[in-house]
Structure formats: structure tokens, C-alpha cells
């Protein structure tokens, strides 16, 4: 058995694309080898400057293959049959027949001879390289090949020899290169073992997983050495492993003056911009240290540390300057600047949006002064220096500025959390923050729908589906007894619009169905859904439990039987007890009369479980009615009266849910 070693050596591959490339090339090569009857064990390694394929257990020759090719039916015109024979260079006598769906077809068995693997590998490799689709790729120079970054070299060795491979302007060889900064020299290799060893000798760790383990171990060791804690950050570890060929973890210091910055600012400066790891003391407070990953082993590590400390100090100095500039002004004093910030070309500026949000909050919770204050100030930090530098800190900086001004925690927290939830995995805000988040998201969604930005099958540029789910989650997880239909009407009035109500309510209904269908049957959802979402969820849960029980199943069957008897007939008029001629119909009507007011009261109290239990009292008399009474009596008055009785029962059930949809 033979082995194949392929290295695509390039300029720096973006770290966030490396893992996908590793998985993508592994799948592609595995599939293409299998399709070519080459059954090999395939491994792919990825790093900042190289993607490496290592395949083992390759045979030296392919096994003979047989492929059965279907031709025309035996009843086809002779010209079609001759054309098939000509296309495959065979005579009609060489064809076999096979019965498919009671029809005989001609078949030709195509046989391929065994071939040396090294003859077919170049074509397979080029096909596999081209098959992977990068999220972004580029041409460079006058070359005709396209890749994520300019390719500089291709190493390709099969069975100890260079495989004659041509990819664009590059010809395969047996050369690789060491670490770009410390050992950037040509390395001749003979096989995979030699390749991996020489890379390691020249400060390149081939395996991404191994680089990540080195980083994890280094982070923990240095954190423990200072008696500090480090928060687990798998995503950042993966990213820095994609930035370094030979990771070395080092410890730097932060000047004490910078610790007066909010911790989110420190984290944003260090993690997002510098790819540094934050450290905390045992009480959870920010420690004046940071960890970073150096790309390579350098003789003077202290110089590397000082350089990184200097870079971080410069960034934090800017942040501290912005912070002090910001706290010199109140949030209210920034409101005028919001007039210069466009929310949407058709919807006005952020100052106008603030007025809408405030009006909605006042509609939801009249006389809630803290909520109204938070609503008026919730967007002020968007025109601050700090949020201009760190957009992800919107809301968070508003919280700190509100606290600095002396506003209470309820107001500050509402400003901070009013963007929540920002996705399915994000938590929902509570208290005033939930009401403010609801008002903000609702105003955005209603306004953007009016502006013609409704989602389509091809896109949702303003993430309105996510906004709607956020609103639904806020209402349900906070058990807000609000009618979304009323809120939509009120929000539309703020834009002087009422024409788009049906569009928006339909959109919310579809999103509510999407939300509920993870837990409930779609038929049940269709039977109870309205835009009082808390009530809808309560009905769903109650009905789901009830319909599992025997009584629930029997009641549903009784409803369907009554509904089928009524059919499309329009039943009018009250039930006339004097027309009853049988005991079962008298008994049924008596139960209906007795339980109806109790059911109506239970529904008004949202006690749906009691209402359903009361409906269960219908089971015995309605079964007797169906067994012993002819509904469509020859006397039309009697028939109409019995139909009216069944209609009453159906209407009673439909007060809880649309049973005709179950």
C-alpha cells in the first residue's frame, strides 16, 4: 500500500475559514477517491499558510470496474438502438436485456481495466482542489487559478516520488517551508513522517487540534501561576490557533489606570481587537494581566511581551479618553444628535424612533416613569465616542453612563438590555427592559414592513423574522398579557398607517406558528392561535394534555360527528325544547343548558382546564343521542331543531378552540 502527501502552500489563510476548509477538503477527497474506486484513509490538516492532505492505504493500481449502462427499450426505433451502440462502440449482440416496470430495456456492461494509481491521481487531485468553494476567493497576478489567497507552492509526493501535478502556473515538487518568522527556508521531504518532523523542527505544528491543545495548556498554566482565573473561550482559542504556526502563550501586564474602564470595554479591546485573553481574580474582578499567543518561539520573549503591552496600552488609552469624554455629557444632552442619525430613509431619524418607542411604552405601561425615562434615553449612547469605536457595546455603555449620572438600576438595566434577545440563543430581558425591548422591536418591525422591507424567500436584510421571534419570546417568557393585534394597530397609527395591518398580523401569525411548532402539533396550533400569545400558549398546553386523555379523544370524535351531520347547512334559530320527542335529546339539551354558563365563565377566567372538564359531561348524553336519535327526522321542524342542538354544542366547543381544524 502507498501513501499520498499533498500540501497547498499559500499566503495567510483567514483563521475563521480554516476549520471549514479542513472539513470541506476531507469530505471532498474522501468522496472523489471513493468514486474513483480508491479506498484510502484520508486526513486533512490546516494552518495559517498550508492545507495538507495525507492519504494512506492507497493501492498501486485500481481494480477492474464494471458499470451497467441503461439503453433504450427493445421496442424503440432501430435508429435509437443503433445510436446507443455507436455511442458506446459496441454491437447489438453485446447488449443484454433487463425487465424494468414490465418493460424490457437494453443494457451494456462497460468494463474498465486496472490502471496505475499515479496515472489518475493528478486529475483527481486537481478536481478536488477546485471543488471546494471558499466563502471568498481571489485571482492574483496574471494567473488563471482562483483561491482564498495566492498559492505559492504545491508539494505532492506519492509512494516516495514527486507526482507530476500541474495546477495553474505551479508545478508540484517535494519542497515545503518552515515558520515564516523564525525558519522561513526550503525543506525537502520524502514522505509524511519526514514532512511532519521537519516542520516541527522548523517551528511549525501541523495539526490544528494540537495547536489548540498547546494554547489551552499554556493559558491554564500561566493563569494558575498568577493565582488567577481565565474564562473558557473555545472560539478565541480556535481563532488564535489559526493565526499561529507555533503557538507560545505569554503573560502581559495592564496599567492599573485602565481598570476603571467598564469590563466590557476591556474585553472588547483585548478579545475582539487584539485576540488577547482576559484574566480575573478569585472574586471575579478584572485582573491587571492578560494572556496572548505569540506566533513562534523567540529568543527575547520579554521584548515580544513589551511590544504587545505597548499595543494594548495605546488601544486602552484611546478607550479611556473616549470614556472620559462620554461621561462628561449626559445621555439626555445627546438626544439632539440622534436627529442626524437616519433610522431608515422612509422612516425618519433615531430621534423620531425614540418618540415612537416612548409612545408604545406609555401605551403598554401607563405611568411607569422609569420605563418612560429609559425609553427616552435608550439610543443616546449610539452617538457616544465609545459606541462609535465599539459598536457591539451599544446599550452596555448606555447602562454605565446612566449609572454614572445617578439614574437607578431599573432605568440603567432597561437601557442595557433593550436589544435582547439578539438571537435564539440569547436570553430574554425582564422587567422594564422587556417592555422597552418589545416597544423597540415592534416599532422597528412595523416601520420596516410599511417601508416595503418585508422578508422574501430570497432574503431578510433587516432580520425581521428574528425580530418577530424576539417579540414573541419577550411576551411569552415574561407572561405579558398583551394583545399583539392591539399593539400592531397602535404602532401603525404612529406612522399614520392602517393599510398594512393584515400584512403584519399575518407575518406575526406565521412566526408564532414557527415558534410553537417545536412543541405542539400544527393542527392544534391552527385551532387556537391568535395574537394574545400567552393565552394561546395556555390553551395549547391545556388542550395538548386533554386530547391525550380518553375523554378528550371521545369529545373530539363527538364534535367531528356532529359537524359532519351539520355539513354545509346554515343552521339558524334557537333550540325549541317543546319539539323534543325522545329522552336522549331531552337529556342532552338539559346538560348543555346546565354547563353552558359555567363554561362561558371558565373561559372568561381563562380556566380552560375546567371548561374542558365541563364539556366532558356531554359525552354520555351525546353518545346516547347519536345511538338512538335520527337527526334528519322526516318532520323538517324536528330535524332543524336537532341540528340546532348539535350546532349549539359545536359552538360551545369552538369557544375554546376551532375544533373543526383538529
From Swiss-Prot:
Keywords: Aminoacyl-tRNA synthetase, ATP-binding, Cytoplasm, Ligase, Nucleotide-binding, Protein biosynthesis. GO terms for molecular function: arginine-tRNA ligase activity; ATP binding; glycine-tRNA ligase activity. It holds the Pfam family tRNA_synt_2f. InterPro entries: DALR_anticod-bd, Gly-tRNA-synth_bsu, Gly-tRNA-synth_heterodimer. It is found in: Cytoplasm. One of its GO terms (biological process) is arginyl-tRNA aminoacylation. One of its GO terms (cellular component) is cytosol. SUPFAM superfamilies: HD-domain/PDEase-like (SSF109604). The keyword Signal does not apply. Belongs to the class-II aminoacyl-tRNA synthetase family. Tetramer of two alpha and two beta subunits. This is Glycine--tRNA ligase beta subunit. The lineage of its organism: Bacteria, Pseudomonadati, Pseudomonadota, Alphaproteobacteria, Rickettsiales.
Amino acid at each position: 500500500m502507498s501513501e499520498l502527501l499533498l500540501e497547498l502552500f499559500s499566503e495567510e489563510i483567514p483563521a475563521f475559514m480554516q476549520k471549514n476548509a479542513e472539513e470541506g477538503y476531507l469530505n471532498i477527497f474522501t468522496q472523489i477517491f471513493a468514486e474513483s474506486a480508491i479506498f484510502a484513509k484520508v486526513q486533512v490538516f490546516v494552518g495559517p499558510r498550508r492545507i495538507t492532505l495525507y492519504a494512506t492505504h492507497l493501492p498501486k493500481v485500481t481494480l477492474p470496474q464494471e458499470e451497467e449502462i441503461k439503453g433504450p427499450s427493445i421496442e424503440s426505433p432501430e435508429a435509437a438502438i443503433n445510436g446507443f451502440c455507436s455511442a458506446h462502440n459496441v454491437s447489438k449482440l453485446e447488449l443484454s436485456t433487463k425487465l424494468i416496470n414490465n418493460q424490457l430495456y437494453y443494457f451494456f456492461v462497460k468494463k474498465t481495466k486496472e490502471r496505475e494509481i499515479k496515472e489518475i491521481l493528478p486529475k483527481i487531485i486537481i478536481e478536488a482542489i477546485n471543488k471546494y468553494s471558499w466563502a471568498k476567493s481571489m485571482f492574483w497576478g496574471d494567473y488563471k487559478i482562483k483561491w482564498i489567497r495566492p498559492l505559492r507552492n504545491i508539494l505532492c509526493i506519492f509512494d516516495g516520488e514527486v507526482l507530476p501535478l500541474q495546477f495553474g502556473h505551479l508545478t508540484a515538487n517535494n519542497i515545503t517551508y518552515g515558520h515564516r518568522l523564525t525558519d522561513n527556508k526550503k525543506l525537502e521531504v520524502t514522505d509524511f513522517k519526514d514532512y511532519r518532523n521537519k516542520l516541527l523542527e522548523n517551528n511549525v505544528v501541523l495539526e490544528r487540534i494540537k495547536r489548540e491543545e498547546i494554547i489551552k495548556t499554556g493559558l491554564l498554566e500561566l493563569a494558575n501561576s498568577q493565582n488567577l482565573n481565565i474564562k473558557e473561550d473555545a472560539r478565541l482559542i480556535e481563532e488564535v490557533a489559526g493565526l499561529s504556526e507555533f503557538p507560545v502563550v505569554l503573560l502581559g501586564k495592564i496599567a492599573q489606570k485602565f481598570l476603571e474602564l467598564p469590563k466590557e470595554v476591556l474585553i472588547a479591546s483585548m478579545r475582539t481587537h487584539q485576540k488577547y485573553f482576559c484574566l480575573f481574580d478569585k472574586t471575579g474582578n478584572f485582573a491587571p494581566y492578560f494572556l496572548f499567543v505569540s506566533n513562534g518561539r523567540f529568543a527575547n520573549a520579554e521584548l515580544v511581551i513589551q511590544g504587545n503591552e505597548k499595543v494594548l496600552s495605546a488601544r486602552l488609552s484611546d478607550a479611556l479618553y473616549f470614556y472620559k469624554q462620554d461621561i462628561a455629557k449626559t445621555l439626555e444632552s445627546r438626544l439632539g444628535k440622534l436627529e442626524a442619525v437616519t433610522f431608515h430613509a422612509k422612516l425618519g431619524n433615531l430621534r423620531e424612533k425614540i418618540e415612537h418607542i416612548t409612545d408604545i411604552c406609555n401605551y403598554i405601561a401607563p405611568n411607569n416613569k422609569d420605563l418612560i425615562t429609559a425609553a427616552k434615553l435608550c439610543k443616546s449612547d449610539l452617538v457616544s465616542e465609545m459606541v462609535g469605536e465599539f459598536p457591539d457595546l451599544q446599550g452596555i455603555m448606555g447602562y454605565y453612563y446612566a449609572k454614572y449620572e445617578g439614574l437607578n438600576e431599573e432605568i440603567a438595566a432597561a437601557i442595557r438590555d433593550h436589544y435582547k434577545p439578539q438571537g435564539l440563543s440569547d436570553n430574554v430581558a425582564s422587567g422594564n427592559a422587556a417592555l422597552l425591548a418589545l416597544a423597540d422591536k415592534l416599532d422597528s418591525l412595523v416601520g420596516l414592513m410599511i417601508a416595503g422591507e418585508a422578508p422574501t424567500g430570497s432574503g431578510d436584510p433587516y432580520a425581521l423574522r428574528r425580530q418577530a421571534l424576539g417579540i414573541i419570546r419577550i411576551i411569552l417568557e415574561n407572561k405579558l398579557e398583551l394583545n399583539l393585534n392591539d399593539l400592531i394597530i397602535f404602532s401603525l397609527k404612529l406612522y399614520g398607517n392602517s393599510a398594512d395591518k393584515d400584512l403584519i398580523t399575518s407575518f406575526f401569525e406565521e412566526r408564532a406558528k414557527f415558534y410553537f411548532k417545536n412543541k405542539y402539533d400544527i393542527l392544534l396550533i391552527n385551532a387556537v392561535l391568535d395574537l394574545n400569545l400567552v393565552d394561546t400558549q395556555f390553551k395549547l398546553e391545556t388542550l395538548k394534555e386533554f386530547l391525550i386523555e380518553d375523554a378528550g379523544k371521545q369529545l373530539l370524535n363527538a364534535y367531528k360527528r356532529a359537524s359532519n351531520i351539520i355539513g354545509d347547512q346554515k343552521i339558524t334559530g334557537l333550540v325549541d325544547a317543546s319539539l323534543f320527542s325522545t329522552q336522549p335529546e331531552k337529556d342532552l339539551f338539559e346538560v348543555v343548558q346546565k354547563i353552558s354558563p359555567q363554561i362561558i365563565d371558565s373561559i372568561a377566567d381563562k380556566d380552560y382546564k375546567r371548561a374542558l372538564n365541563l364539556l366532558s359531561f356531554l359525552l354520555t348524553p351525546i353518545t346516547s343521542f347519536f345511538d338512538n336519535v335520527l337527526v334528519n327526522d322526516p318532520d323538517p321542524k324536528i330535524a332543524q331543531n336537532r341540528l340546532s342542538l348539535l350546532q349549539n354544542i359545536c359552538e360551545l366547543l369552538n369557544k375554546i378552540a376551532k375544533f373543526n381544524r383538529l
